[in-house]
Amino acid sequence: MISSDPEAVSASAYREAMAQLASAVHLVTTDGPGGRAGLTATSVCSVSDGPPTLLVCLNRNSSAYPAFLRNGVLCINTLTAAHEGLATDFAGRVPQAERFAGPDWGRLQTGAPVLAGALVAFDCRIVDRHEVGTHDVLICAVEALAEISGAESLLYAGRHYRVLPRTESKGD
């Protein structure tokens, strides 16, 4: 059924439709006066390359949410196939205080935790915020990048983790 009536789309039908989309999996992390916190997110998107800007959507009911707002900085760590367990941990399987106990964490310019071995990490300052429904859309200026690992990407689709194999790019 195709409908243009926004009231005709229930929250559960919308969530089911969104579950069909394949998305990269990220750990979004922060540290500063509001404390260290992190969560798993798939709602990350490039906004512009001039200046480099990303957006990330965070649920205002998340236990980590206040730390992100108070700190004003975050790092978007894009996960590889080797990080599926971490994705589950940061999605709520373990308490906030235990989420950073595992692998090596570093820091770039903002001080937000950067996951060693991430596919790529975008170190950002939050420059704007928009409330939409249950979430905030955070507009984030990219201040630094961690080295790109070249590993296989971790995706989430159909309510399961999937792996996107690396392919060799062919030159012209």
Swiss-Prot record:
Lipoprotein is among the record's keywords: no
Keyword line: Flavoprotein, FMN, NAD, Oxidoreductase
Catalytic activity: FMNH2 + NAD(+) = FMN + NADH + 2 H(+)
Gene Ontology terms, MF aspect: FMN binding; FMN reductase (NADH) activity; FMN reductase [NAD(P)H] activity; riboflavin reductase (NADPH) activity
SUPFAM superfamilies: FMN-binding split barrel
Top-level taxonomic group: Bacteria
Organism annotation: Methylorubrum extorquens (strain CM4 / NCIMB 13688) (Methylobacterium extorquens)
EC class name: oxidoreductase
Functional note: Catalyzes the reduction of FMN to FMNH2 which is used to reduce pyrimidine by RutA via the Rut pathway.
Family from the record: Belongs to the non-flavoprotein flavin reductase family. RutF subfamily.
Protein name: FMN reductase (NADH) RutF 2
EC numbers for this chain: 1.5.1.42
Gene3D superfamilies the UniProt entry points to: Electron Transport, Fmn-binding Protein, Chain A
GO BP, sorted A to Z: nitrogen utilization; uracil catabolic process
PANTHER family according to UniProt: FLAVIN REDUCTASE, FMN REDUCTASE (NADH) RUTF
Source taxonomy: Bacteria, Pseudomonadati, Pseudomonadota, Alphaproteobacteria, Hyphomicrobiales
InterPro entries from the UniProt entry: Flavin_Rdtase-like_dom (IPR002563), NADH-dep_flavin_reductase (IPR050268), RutF (IPR019917), Split_barrel_FMN-bd (IPR012349)
